[in-house]
């Protein structure tokens, strides 16, 4: 769902940082 997309985006950002 939308929450999954947001969590994936947050995880991607954390991986970049």
Swiss-Prot record:
Q: Can you name a GO cellular component term?
A: extracellular region
Positions modified as Valine amide?
17
- A Pfam family it matches: Antimicrobial_8
Q: Which organism is it from?
A: Uperoleia mjobergii (Mjoberg's toadlet)
* UniProt entry tagged with the keyword Nuclease: no
> In which tissues does this protein get expressed?
Expressed by the skin dorsal glands.
The biological processes this protein is annotated with in GO are:
defense response
Localisation: Secreted
Keywords from the named record: Amidation, Amphibian defense peptide, Secreted
What name does the UniProt record give this protein? Uperin-3.4
User: Is Secreted among the key words of this record?
Assistant: yes
């Amino acid at each position: 769902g939308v929450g999954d997309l947001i969590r994936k985006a947050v995880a991607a950002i954390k991986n970049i940082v």
